């Protein structure tokens, strides 16, 4: 009997440690900042959303397995939290960005619930060219059309809270498939 009680206390202690670890992991998941700096139609953001949903679901299942008590949580709320707090995208093409928003909405829409607001986390701009570009190159050398096409992106202005917390935790993206000649035409042969 004493051995049984000792094993039972050891098991309870291990369960408490595991529950603490799960809660720490859940908190870290909620704080994770994922960026696609050339998000296009949002394919990588959708995959990141699915991964974060799976991880949140796994944590809830582990808590249920250990405690025998199901947590009260709503996957729609989890999805809205992920969209609001975890996923960020930038694209130089405004139309592609709208397609990314539409793809995320189509992927997460639930009847009877409003669509998530994505404008704060999905931004239009050239993620490779920052606001100091015109300090290095005289603005008047570029026509208005060229300036619009260059579309400098100010990370600090677009995502101040993320930058203040140290930046993004994870960057997901395809490599830029751009001809070098296009860069030379816009930026010169530096």
Regions found by a protein language model. Give the residues of each.
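SAM-dependent methyltransferase catalytic region
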Residues: 1-190
